[in-house]
Each structure stands twice: as structure tokens, then as C-alpha cells.
């Protein structure tokens, strides 16, 4: 994966308002904002197509990005993205500043691996994914692009919870930090495949005798 998807050029935007944003979009520019830390929020403009291409990669949403803001590097995380309801177009993007030495809080996707090696799945079980990402906190340098959920040893009827996951060093689950069972969320369950509806032979026989 090219590091280019994690580096974006941006410029400070002073022409604000809906009309200005519409003009930017007609020029294939993307309005956005950077906030967080002790600095004031900054409205910015980016190249829409470059951001749209980067947004096709899952890691774009769980990776510390570098915005070259008028030539000055600023480290950020994607916090929100507004898309057009039916066109392949991004309407607005929000970034949060990453502050050196401060923990970041963000969602990281889960990758379910080795399902094909699970005896339960081989026996016809179906893996029901309850969540596909979890909220974590860590130092920026420790932020993983994804967290693996190893399904190889999961048995039929078993539910994997947050507390069963192996998190990378320095990474903590926000939910588990609340220290009660209600926040030990179910991640995935392997369930038996639903049985086909059984024929009511007695009913059929009774109907044939009438």
C-alpha cells in the first residue's frame, strides 16, 4: 500500500459559507475542517479526487494522516466524512489534530481471520459478526490499522467478546476500560446453520385422505 494515501495537500480556506463550498465542489475541490487541541478550528480545502481515491482504502480511516497545510505538516485523524446521497462524491471532511504525547481515541476495524480453519464453520456453522470495528485509545505511534479476530479455535455456539481479543501493545479498548460486564461486548458468534423447514408428513397425509 502506497504511503501516498496517507499524505494530502491542503490549504487554509477563508471564503466560507454554503455558496463558497458549492463553488469549490464544482472545481473538484473538497471543503473540510481541522479541529482539536488548543488551536482554533481551521477551515481547509483539499483536492477532492485525491481524497476520494485515498478513502477507498480501509486504512485511511484508522491511520495517522499528514496534511501538508500550505506546506506545513499537520498530523490528523479522519473523524467524519459526509458523502453525497447517491453520487460517488465526498461533500465535506472533518479531521482531528493528533497531539504528540496525547492518546488518541478512534475506531479501528476488525479483521476476522481463519474462519475457513474453524471446525465449527467446517461443520456448517455460520459466523455472525456483531461488530466490525471497536473504539480504542493509544498513543499515535501505537495506532493499529486493524485488529485481528482469530476464528480458528472458535467452537459451535461460542461467542467471542471484547475481552477475548488480543490487542496490540499499548492499545486499550474504550469499552473494556469502563470495567463492567455490560461493556464486554459480543464480537462474533458461531451459530449452527438454520435447519430447513421440516415437512409436516402427518398433515400431508391427512390432507390426502380428505
Swiss-Prot record:
SUPFAM superfamilies: Ribosomal protein L25-like. PANTHER family: RIBOSOMAL PROTEIN L25/GLN-TRNA SYNTHETASE, ANTI-CODON-BINDING DOMAIN-CONTAINING PROTEIN, RIBOSOMAL PROTEIN L25_GLN-TRNA SYNTHETASE, ANTI-CODON-BINDING DOMAIN-CONTAINING PROTEIN. This is Large ribosomal subunit protein bL25. One of its GO terms (biological process) is translation. Disulfide bonds: none annotated. Residues 199-210 have a biased composition (Acidic residues). Pfam families: Ribosomal_L25p, Ribosomal_TL5_C. Residues 191-210 are annotated as: Disordered. Belongs to the bacterial ribosomal protein bL25 family. CTC subfamily. GO terms for molecular function: 5S rRNA binding; structural constituent of ribosome. It comes from Alteromonas mediterranea (strain DSM 17117 / CIP 110805 / LMG 28347 / Deep ecotype). Keywords: Ribonucleoprotein, Ribosomal protein, RNA-binding, rRNA-binding. InterPro entries: Rbsml_bL25/Gln-tRNA_synth_N, Ribosomal_bL25/Gln-tRNA_synth, Ribosomal_bL25_b-dom, Ribosomal_bL25_C, Ribosomal_bL25_long, Ribosomal_bL25_short, Ribosomal_L25_dom, Ribosomal_uL5_bac-type. One of its GO terms (cellular component) is cytosolic large ribosomal subunit. This is one of the proteins that binds to the 5S RNA in the ribosome where it forms part of the central protuberance. Part of the 50S ribosomal subunit; part of the 5S rRNA/L5/L18/L25 subcomplex. Contacts the 5S rRNA. Binds to the 5S rRNA independently of L5 and L18.
